[in-house]
């Protein structure tokens, strides 16, 4: 029967703190002079001053990391992970205790100059947010640490930078700026920059926090190759529990102390490495075929999902024309026109003429006539758009009976004088009919004189309005017309509605538009 190994085993349990439930290593267990240790921390404390009070971030951390190890640091927020990473990276100094990094002893008395040189020469950083210089290309970003170190010539720096970018799969992105790269590509440039000076330790602060599943697998494969092939020590802070199985040891932190240390079994780690390599091979095949893959589960690597970004292209023909709707409902329009009787005379209403009208309010109902060469487009119930071209064709298509409907309708230029006389005799209207002959000679309407002004096209969409003396309601007709156009149907208004004149609607629309 095959022996089953647990994924992790707890390394040492000493000096248990019942309140915090933490596990620490005694100082006697730390060999400060072990040459195999790339990092040794002994009773490290860090306290930040907040006013007159001190806030402890680290409280007696002791540990040793051997050269070439892969360490994962886990813990809740506020547990001291980032503070410990800053101290290891010489960005900050401990308040108390000693640390030995790459053979150099560091304490609270170490100068910033010594820390800066040690950081430049022996440590590489990979951050969650990449921290690339936006004004420099990928090649120039990788060259920057080598320029600061000053050990290579310009040609040697460029040659090494190209070699590093080729290693991380960015050979075709040398002259691209960070804004032109995806998140995974930026992280690969960050890794190339971090290893530019051949560091002994690579510090990783949430390196896959901003990446998707595919890029996470690619980055982890790249990091594990650096660890195994070039013997670079990796110390990674992460919240992704799926990444801990690639490491050698797992350090759990809580309240500024090491809670426990776990060691990952070789068999379990080997299985995860094999699965990672298979995933990366499949990713490479899909990328060659132009497909981006996402693994839904760990058991079936072939079960992938295509990803992509769709761009919507809109053309004028994609918009719905309400004119076509009116053509299909011409019977409804004719019925609404024929059923409108002499209600305006009974109510002592005012009639307003508009020679370019394509709809009329009759008997409290808004009806739309069939319009040729002029379309009203609407998309997703947004604001309607009107086309005021060829209004003369509209006028020629509108023939209403003025004697029966008491409306000032638009007839052909040959019948304009007769229609105006009928309107003046039957309706006693105070509209602009006295000058209709001259108006008709000048393309019949204000809207024809202002073909580029859409306000008059909207205002002329009603050829007569009933002005009732009962002021029981003060509703705006603009919203009603807007809804009517969007819905493409006739709106029903009650006879008690106080409708506005064309000039009033024009003024309202001027304020809105």
Curated annotation (Swiss-Prot):
Region listing for Disordered, in residue ranges: 291-471
SUPFAM superfamilies: P-loop containing nucleoside triphosphate hydrolases (SSF52540)
GO biological process: sorocarp morphogenesis; transmembrane transport
Domain ABC transporter, chain residue ranges per copy: 39-280
Presence of the UniProt keyword Cell membrane in the record: no
Keywords: ATP-binding, Nucleotide-binding, Transport
Keyword Transport carried by entry: yes
Gene3D superfamilies, A to Z: P-loop containing nucleotide triphosphate hydrolases
Polar residues: bias regions: 361-386
Annotated Gene Ontology cellular component terms: ATP-binding cassette (ABC) transporter complex; plasma membrane
Any one GO molecular-function label of the UniProt entry: transmembrane transporter activity
Biased composition (Low complexity): 324-360, 387-471
InterPro entries: AAA+_ATPase, ABC_transporter-like_ATP-bd, ABC_transporter-like_CS, ABC_transpr_LolD-like, MacB-like_ATP-bd, P-loop_NTPase
Residue ranges the record marks as coiled coil: none
Binding site for ATP: 75-82
UniProt-listed PANTHER family: ABC TRANSPORTER H FAMILY MEMBER 2, IMPORT ATP-BINDING PROTEIN
Family: Belongs to the ABC transporter superfamily.
Protein's name according to its UniProt entry: ABC transporter H family member 2
